[in-house]
Amino acid sequence: MASGVMVSDDVIKVFNEMKVRHQLSPEDAKKRKKAVVFCLSDDKKTIILEPGKEILQGDIGCNVEDPYKTFVKMLPRNDCRYALYDALYETKETKKEDLVFVFWAPEEASLKSKMIYASSKDAIKKRLPGIKHEWQINTYEDVNDPCNLADKLGGNTVVSLEGKSVRS
């Protein structure tokens, strides 16, 4: 079911910036986004960047100790969101970095919010081509455990996420 919701040009621009990994100057590399959260505009007609809900690569190690935990804290307890998370992980063979499209639909969100976000998900996904991983999350228990993201990225082959071990 399509909702008729549009995707803002800013969302597409941020996605393209996150998707392309090329040699950046040290200054530009610090400005590269690690995570962003998208929400619906007040009139519920456009998917937009949620103001202030981003993590920059340059923040990591300065005012962001654990990018994954910081990302989790950006998700509202009682409303839906979309997000992009640039996951840095290691498998038994190699280090990898992949974008993950996140659909956050917590149990505490209103039915109306869940319905409009669910029906608009295809609209945003069509505008963000080439994403390898999609993760729908409905509880804080699921999102708080980095092993769940590791499972989405490669199951038992993933040994660390953001430099932290995910397997005991």
UniProtKB/Swiss-Prot annotation:
Which organism was this protein described from? Xenopus laevis (African clawed frog)
Sorted keywords for this record are:
Acetylation, Actin-binding, Cytoplasm, Cytoskeleton, Membrane, Nucleus, Phosphoprotein
Q: How is it modified after translation?
A: Inactive when phosphorylated. Phosphorylation levels vary during development. Oocytes contain only the phosphorylated form, and 80-95% of cfl1 protein is phosphorylated in unfertilized eggs. Rapid dephosphorylation occurs within 30 minutes after fertilization. Phosphorylation levels increase again between the morula and blastula stages (5-8 hpf) and then decrease again as gastrulation approaches. Dephosphorylated by pdxp.
Protein name from the UniProt record: Cofilin-1-A
What is the annotated localization of this protein?
Nucleus matrix; Cytoplasm, Cytoskeleton; Cytoplasm, Cell cortex; Membrane
Residues annotated with N-acetylalanine modification: 2
What PANTHER family does this protein's entry cite? Answer: COFILIN-RELATED
Tissue specificity, per the record, is:
Expressed diffusely in both animal and vegetal hemispheres of the oocyte. During cleavage, expression accumulates around the cleavage furrow, along the vegetal membrane, and later in the midbody. Strongly expressed in the animal hemisphere during blastula stages, with most cells showing expression by gastrulation. By stage 17, expression is highest in cells of the developing neuroectoderm, and at stage 24 the notochord, neural tube, neural crest, somites and some cells of the archenteron show high expression.
Q: What does this protein do?
A: May play a role in the regulation of cell morphology and cytoskeletal organization. Binds to F-actin and exhibits pH-sensitive F-actin depolymerizing activity. Required for formation of the cleavage furrow during cytokinesis.
Q: What is the lineage of its organism?
A: Eukaryota, Metazoa, Chordata, Craniata, Vertebrata
Q: Where is motif Nuclear localization signal found?
A: 30-34
The superkingdom listed in its UniProt entry is Eukaryota
Name all ADF-H domain ranges.
4-153
